[in-house]
Design a protein with these regions (language model features):
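Conserved Asp/Asn-Gly motif in the active-site loop of CheY-like receiver
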Residues: 34-38, 93, 111
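Active-site beta3 strand of CheY-like receiver
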Residues: 47-53
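Helix N-cap/capping motif at the beta->alpha junctions
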Residues: 33-42, 63-65
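C-terminal output helix
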Residues: 91, 109-118
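Receiver (REC) domain active-site loop signature in two-component systems and cognate sites
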Residues: 58
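Alpha4 helix (beta4-alpha4-beta5 surface) of REC/receiver domains from two-component response regulators
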Residues: 65, 88-103
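Charged docking surfaces used in two-component/phosphorelay signaling
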Residues: 18-26
């Protein structure tokens, strides 16, 4: 039996990380956490996750800088990255996608929203 995909949750809010972890674990996925982009980049140098749920606004290194750094790394597998933020302007969404994000979700989100995105990117199947 193969291991379940590893999902890296990157958010400066411990509450958001916990909520996302609870959802991902309930879907049978493995999780790891980072509280800012720099920690996420360091984590990915050691262990390449299959999926990254990445907040935009964080200290140390913001999400878009982290995304660009991740896309500049030779990661195997290349992680699926879903940007997650309160920023909803079309310019922000375009910037995230042009920087290498695979998808984009708005905060606050719930289990159904995250499940839909995970299904869209092929990480889980919708029941």
């Amino acid at each position: 039996m193969s291991q379940q995909p590893l999902c890296l949750i990157v958010d400066d809010s411990r509450v958001i990380r916990r909520m996302a972890k609870d959802i991902l674990v309930s879907l049978g996925l493995r999780t790891a956490e980072a509280e800012h982009g720099l920690a996420a980049v360091e984590f990915c140098r050691r262990t390449a996750p299959e999926f990254v749920l990445l907040d935009w606004n964080m200290p140390e290194m913001d999400g878009i800088s982290c995304l660009r750094a991740l896309r500049g790394m030779d990661l195997n597998p290349r992680p699926i990255v879903v940007m997650c933020t309160t920023e909803n302007g079309l310019a922000k969404i375009r910037e995230a996608l042009e920087s290498g994000a695979d998808e984009y979700i708005m905060k606050p989100y719930d289990r159904e929203v995250l499940l839909d995105k995970l299904a869209q990117v092929g990480l889980v199947e919708r029941a």
